[in-house]
């Protein structure tokens, strides 16, 4: 879904709060090895690298991995989340899938989780809900673009993001996650650039033969003020977290 927009993805995708990974690391039984599955351009990997002795980060997209930051203790591998032969049995202390699990074949992924998880390992599926702008007028334009203009072009599994993964199959006893959100100060073009990473925008271009982003840009320009004005933009975080046997 993301290979053809890998550079834009790494440029515009928002970063997670470091305290989220501090929280997850404190839950892990040890800090020897973390697995970031469906790592994309390494948005979560960079945080895990400072907290664990080793990190293995996997993604099926080589284009995405090519944009990921390099660390001495991180190994990147082109592999699907459902099959990570680079990982040994019962070796991983923390398994993270950040904004990725809704793409997985979950029964096969959970089988792989059970194979690689160390005793008492933690599994955390992280998602951020759809973008919100604090300015209500600008937010109304963005929500109209999301819910009307490109809504028909989202993959079916997108609804899992909108429910904060509560609709996702998760056959484990759960632990609550921290109450956090991603928050940035963005100008108009950053909001438009971020929207350009949406898989629905890519599918709109493919099926309609034109780019929908000018629709969003025109709408935001009419209400934004100076284009380089910064507006608070945020994504509420949601989780499914468990401790494995």
Q: What are the residue ranges of the model-derived segments?
A:
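Conserved class I S-adenosyl-L-methionine
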Residues: 1-30
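Conserved acidic residues
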Residues: 32, 53, 93
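Class I SAM-dependent methyltransferase SAM/SAH-binding core
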Residues: 35, 41-84
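A short acidic, Gly/Pro-enriched loop at the edge of an enzyme's catalytic core
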Residues: 84-94
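A short SAM/SAH-binding and catalytic strip from SAM-dependent methyltransferases
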Residues: 93-107
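A short glycine-rich, Lys/Arg-flanked "PGG" loop and its adjoining helix->strand segment in the class I
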Residues: 108-119
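Conserved catalytic/acceptor-binding region of the Class I
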Residues: 119-185
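Conserved Class I S-adenosyl-L-methionine
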Residues: 163-245
């Amino acid at each position: 879904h993301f290979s053809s927009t890998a550079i834009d993805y790494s440029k515009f995708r928002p970063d997670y709060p470091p305290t989220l990974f501090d929280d997850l690391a404190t839950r892990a039984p040890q800090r020897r090895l973390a697995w970031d599955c469906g790592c994309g351009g390494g948005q979560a990997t960079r945080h895990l690298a400072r907290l664990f002795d080793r990190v293995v980060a996997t993604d099926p997209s080589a284009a995405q991995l090519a944009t990921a930051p390099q660390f001495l203790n991180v190994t990147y591998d082109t592999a699907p989340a459902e099959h990570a032969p680079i990982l040994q049995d019962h070796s991983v202390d923390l398994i993270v899938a950040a904004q990725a699990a809704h793409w997985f074949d979950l029964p096969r992924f959970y089988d792989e989780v059970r194979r690689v998880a160390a005793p008492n390992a933690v599994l955390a599926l992280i998602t951020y809900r759809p973008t919100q702008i604090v300015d209500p007028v600008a937010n109304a334009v963005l929500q109209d673009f999301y819910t009307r203009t490109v809504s028909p072009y989202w993959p079916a599994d997108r609804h899992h993001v909108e429910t904060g993964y509560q609709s996702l199959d998760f056959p484990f006893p759960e632990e609550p996650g921290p109450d956090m959100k991603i928050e940035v100060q963005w100008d108009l073009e950053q909001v438009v650039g971020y929207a350009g990473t949406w898989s629905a925008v890519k599918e709109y271009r493919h099926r309609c033969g034109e780019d929908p982003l000018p629709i969003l840009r025109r709408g935001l320009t009419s209400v934004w003020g100076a284009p380089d004005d910064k507006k608070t933009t945020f994504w509420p975080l949601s989780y499914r977290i468990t401790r494995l046997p």
